[in-house]
Amino acid sequence: MLGYEKDTVAVAFLFLTRTRTRRLKALKIFEQTFASFGLDVLEYRDVPVNPENLGSSALESVPVMVQAFIKRPERAKSMLSFDKRLYTAKQLTKNKLFESELEDSLFFTSLSAKTIVYKALTQSRALDDFYLDLQNPAYETRFCLFHRRFSTNTTTSWDKAQPFRLIGHNGEINTIAGNRSWAKSREKMIGAERNEILTRDGISDSGSLNEMVEALRYRSSIPNVEDILAICMPPANHENNFYKFWSRAMEPWDGPALITYANGYTIGARLDRNGFRPCRWARTEDHFYLSSEAGTFDIAPETIDAKGTLFAGRGVTVDLSNGNVLFRDPSHSRDNYDAPFDPRVEKIPAKIEAIEERFDDKKGVFSFTDDDLSKVIYPMAESGKEPIGSMGDTARLAVLSTEVRSFFDFFYQHFSQVTNPPLDYIREQVVTDLKVYLGKKPNIFEPKELIPPAPAYEVDSPFLSLAQMDFIYSCIDNATDMDRVIPYVIDTTFDINHGTVGFKSKLRKIGEEAVQAVLNKHTILILSDRKASKER
């Protein structure tokens, strides 16, 4: 349809600002940056659209839509090298747009030699009315990833519409704040320039996941998108070394979430370990269908060879080169089955020794109330029961309280409570995982074959027993350079007579001490309040 031979060009689908001067400046940066990588823009094509079906807000913000055809350079011998070159050029372009204060003037809807993303701020049934390309009978494809869903957590816009360049997402990422913080730290690991970021501000949780999947696809040694999604969304209570190895380097992106993807080589989906988003599939002799709901496609029942449900922590991949449908776990794939994955972890003994020492005199120091003890702590410690005191808190915010409050009362978790189904304590054991690894976090962008991870300790819960804490403290004196698991204790208390000035000074010193400890090769930091008393 477009007049180019297969695999000779890539198509960049661009959303551009309607302000002409800013649009021309952004396109100039785009062309020059891509040309510096040997990626010459052959021509631009105005995407034919029919805006009559758009709503008022969508019509007010509709961007200029252009497709740029980019020639594959001769030095890009493989499609993977071509894809990596395109990704690197895109990242540098975004960096330069940021420096020129033009970051909102150009958005890469898609950039690939295999896929083109058509998305709009419109109802799904009106997509082919808006994009006239989708009405053209010459426009054929072997596969399609179609997304229809409104945004629940962010104000929607044209760039936030789905799918993104690699993935489509149904659900939420409730760990997104931590995921974004780790992404920021990884920018230092990969030696990114000051303004080159793995995931930028002002985008949705789905957009952040897409950018991380892209980064891992084109910067790391992880071979396939299905592997990347399995690493980002591992099954609960996994015991095989593949997941242990990668879980040390990548924190989970927890949903509830159903993630679909398409890169032109494979198309597939993965359900996160909570399993709270429906996913139904059906296979006929000629087609494979997957959707959030059964009945989305009008399939004659007699033509269905097999059908089923995608379960929590599982995925499916369709190989577009041969049509094979694979439900196997990526840890058992041909690339990974015989590969050595040594997580280099050792379990800390969880046995709790008899403790004679009492800490009743500390209750007042830490502002524990009788309700905290009788309704929360004692029932949980003695019988493992749910804390009945957690059902609502009508007390005023700690920062506004005239009473002395616990330090922990000043912090709250932010998550999408309204949209999440309930999780009972029985099912919780099956679909959640509390494992924590203590030690140096490996760089997921380093080739795993060349640089084995430093040793670490594995614990089954983020709550450590006193015996486990004593074990970690014992490593301070016994650790050697060969162990590479070297704890460091930072005292977090300060003289109460120094008041607010002392508090601020201590916070600054804690940060400085933590940085210096890491520079001195310590791999576990213990923030200790054991010296807390009436004076500190």
PLM feature spans:
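Conserved short alpha-helical segments that host acidic/polar catalytic motifs at enzyme active sites
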Residues: M1-L450, S465, D477-D483
